[in-house]
Structure formats: structure tokens, C-alpha cells
């Protein structure tokens, strides 16, 4: 986890970049579009499954496939460079599996939960033209993330009680992507690519109680586990044709 000074510096720099981008929105061609992406958890950078142990039980906490969708805007700065921003709805999903080894009582249980955030990405895209209609691009950028309130859930047999609280209400993350897009002046832009997203700091602090003697009986109280929420996604995007945007204007 990054130090507090670096965290605040990153947030301030990202807000400044957003302000500059908004102030320059009248420069260059703009197109608007939509995106839909599955979020695939990755085990790198400290985001792998967590094995939690207590006196009479243990719990494995890991990520599941989530999803993301939203609206995007591209602002062309030159033939090969474009800025892309937008607003996204993001849902990360997690699962937990628990077992107990209490004498005279043995049980296992499973459960899951989801966590929502709203993201404001800002990415710089560099294009390489492969043919008249096909372009490859790579991008690097950052994202401003706003997190929802705490979430709670219970396992399928009520042995495990879960509670997750947000580590902070605002956070930042780093994005990098590569992809291909097909452009048609009358139909629009179709894009498929992949992206990795790495939050700069913990997004969730997760707590468990395992009722190893049965629901409502004695329980193991787990210390908070810190979740990073890194993910890899397959990006699908569609942008309206520039001619349609010019007609609206």
C-alpha cells in the first residue's frame, strides 16, 4: 500500500489533469461511445487469494468475475494521439470458502459478495494505422474511483458472517491497455482490447465471523483483511460516427 503523501499527491495530480482536460474540451474532434467489459481478477501485485486462519476455522477469500459498463468520450489531439475519458459503473465480485476443525463439530460453508464503485478514467491513446479502416492502439492513464458504502452478507448455511467496509471513499488507479479498432465514417468505431487496472491503495477492509459451533453459537472473530481489487478486462467499445456528432452540433 502506498504512503499517505503519495496517495494524496496522486489524487491531486489526477484531479488537476481532469480539470485541464475539461477546460480544453472545445479543442479537437470529439466522439461519444459506450463500453461493456467483464472484469477478470488477477493474482499479481498482491491481489491473489487470501488464506485466513483462526483458532478453530480457516477461510479462503478470492475474486470472481465482475463487470463494468459506462459512457466514454474521445478528444482527438492529433492524427495518432487521442484522450479518452468517461464515467463507468464497476462491480467487483468476491467469494469465500470456510472450514472448521472444532472438536465434535465439523462443517464447511461458502458465500460471496459484490462491491460497487464509480470510475472516471482518463487515458492517453496512441494509434498505429494497420489498414484503411483498422488501427491498433496502446494506452496509459489513470482513474479516479469513488466507492459505495459498506456491504455485508452471510454464507449459504449462515456459519460465516461477512462485513466489508471501504478503506476510503476516493481512490486512484493506474490503467494500461492494448487493442484493435475498426473505423467506418458512416457506422462508427468498434473496438476490442484488453486492459489491466491496479488501484494505488487498498479498496476494502473485510471482516469475518465463523460460527464453528453452529449459527448463533461460539465463533472465531477474524481480523480485517485488506483487498486490492486488481483486475484484467476484455474491453468492448462502440463510438458513434463523427458525422453524427457534427450533425448534432
Predicted regions and their residues:
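Bacterial N-terminal signal peptides that target proteins for export
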Residues: 1-8
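Hydrophobic alpha-helix-in-membranes signature
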Residues: 4, 37-40, 120-122, 193, ...
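Bacterial N-terminal signal peptides
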Residues: 8-17
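Short glycine/proline- and aromatic-enriched beta-strand/turn motifs that initiate or cap beta-hairpins
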Residues: 21-74, 237-244, 249
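Residues that define the transmembrane beta-barrel architecture of outer-membrane proteins
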Residues: 28-30, 63-67, 114-120, 134, ...
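Flexible, solvent-exposed loop segments that connect beta-strands
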Residues: 44-60, 92-115, 148-168, 204-224
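Gram-negative (and chloroplast) outer-membrane scaffold detector with strong preference
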Residues: 74-153, 184, 233-236, 240
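Predominantly the C-terminal beta-signal and adjacent terminal strand-loop region
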Residues: 168-249
Amino acid at each position: 500500500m502506498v504512503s499517505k503523501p503519495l496517495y494524496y499527491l496522486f489524487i491531486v495530480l489526477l484531479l488537476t489533469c481532469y480539470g485541464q482536460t475539461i477546460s480544453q474540451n472545445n479543442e479537437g474532434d470529439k466522439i461519444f461511445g459506450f463500453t461493456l467489459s467483464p472484469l477478470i481478477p488477477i493474482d499479481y501485485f498482491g491481489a491473489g487469494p487470501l488464506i485466513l486462519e483462526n483458532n478453530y476455522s480457516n477461510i479462503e477469500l478470492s475474486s470472481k468475475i465482475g463487470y463494468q459498463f459506462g459512457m466514454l468520450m474521445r478528444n482527438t489531439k492529433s492524427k495518432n494521439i487521442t484522450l479518452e475519458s468517461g464515467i463507468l459503473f464497476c462491480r467487483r465480485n468476491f467469494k469465500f470458502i470456510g472450514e472448521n476443525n472444532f472438536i465434535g463439530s465439523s462443517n464447511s460453508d461458502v458465500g460471496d459478495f459484490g462491491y460497487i464503485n464509480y470510475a472516471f478514467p482518463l487515458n492517453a491513446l496512441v494509434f498505429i494505422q494497420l489498414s484503411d479502416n483498422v488501427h491498433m492502439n496502446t494506452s496509459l492513464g489513470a482513474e479516479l474511483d469513488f466507492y459505495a458504502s459498506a456491504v455485508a452478507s452471510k454464507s449459504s448455511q449462515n456459519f460465516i458472517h461477512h462485513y466489508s467496509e471501504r478503506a476510503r471513499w476516493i481512490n486512484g488507479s493506474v490503467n494500461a491497455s492494448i487493442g484493435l479498432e475498426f473505423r467506418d465514417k458512416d457506422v462508427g468505431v468498434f473496438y476490442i482490447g484488453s486492459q489491466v487496472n491496479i488501484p494505488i491503495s487498498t479498496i476494502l477492509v473485510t471482516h469475518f465471523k465463523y460460527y464453528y459451533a453452529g449459527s448463533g453459537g461460539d465463533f472465531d472473530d477474524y481480523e480485517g483483511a485488506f483487498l486490492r481489487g486488481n483486475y484484467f478486462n476484455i474491453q468492448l467499445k462502440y463510438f458513434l460516427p463523427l458525422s453524427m456528432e457534427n450533425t448534432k452540433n
